[in-house]
Amino acid sequence: CCNLVAEEEGRVVGYILGACADRPLALAFAKRLLWALPRLLLGRFGPPLPHLRYLLRLLRYPGPKAPKDRYPAHLHIAVDPEAQGHGVGKALLAAFLKCLREKGVPGVQLATTRANRAARGLYRAMGFRVYAKRASPFWAPYLGRPLIHEVWVRDLG
């Protein structure tokens, strides 16, 4: 639902992957995981153990969530570091939010960490607010410290 790609001179500089509701997102994730897991175990993505540890950590340390009835849509956004600060993220988010409104979606949520200052500034500027936060050891093995996971929401009604 409402997936978008930003290009500059034929090169992808950003994208948004979104779901209008939780159930289709969960089904798509499960389908993809069923495809990827055997390949992961066979080493097609490199040594399997680090990937398995990551997946287990996702299950062990879930981030906070917002109510699905008020904020059924989810999004993941990424912008190439070289393109950040040039309006790419803002344009992607504006188009994504417009698409959700046109589909009658009442609200959207996303997850980030407190350490992601640039993204948090963008979300705030685009009308999102922090709904919930929780300290999480999820990132500790990768960054050497736990981080604060946050779920941000935006009403669209």
Label every PLM stretch briefly.
Residues Y71, T113-R117, M126, S136-G157:
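C-terminal "cap" of GNAT-fold acetyltransferases
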Residues L17-G18, A73, V88:
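Ligand-binding pocket scaffold of soluble enzyme catalytic domains
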Residues R11-C20:
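Conserved beta-strand in the GNAT
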Residues D22-H76, W139-P141:
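Conserved acyl-donor/pantetheine-binding loop and adjacent beta-alpha core of acyl/acetyltransferases
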Residues C1-V5, A21-A26:
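A short helix-loop-beta-strand connector motif used in the catalytic cores of GNAT acetyltransferases and
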Residues H76-V79, G85-E102, G121-A125:
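Conserved acetyl-CoA-binding loop-helix of GNAT-fold acetyltransferases
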Residues Y71-A73, L100-T113:
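Conserved GNAT acetyl-CoA-binding A-motif
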